[in-house]
């Protein structure tokens, strides 16, 4: 997804509610990952859903959705990350 080139007051005012919503989705394991580029121009979200329509329904609930352009939804065949693996055992 692409974010606006500049953030106006309306966009900035929505950020706290958007972050709260993303945090809730992370806690509920609906969102697996959420990232924004360092220049704040692009974002990536990995969402668990039954199909594209279910994922789009989640994205459309984002408080910042109407500011986003170029939202693409791709179904993943494989998603592997260190965060999704079992924790290492520590022998104290």
Predicted regions and their residues:
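A short linear boundary/processing microfeature
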Residues: 28, 61-65
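Glycine-rich beta-strand-turn "strand-cap" elements at beta-sheet edges
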Residues: 37-38, 64-92
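Short, well-ordered beta-strand segments in beta-rich or mixed alpha/beta enzyme
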Residues: 1-2, 35-62
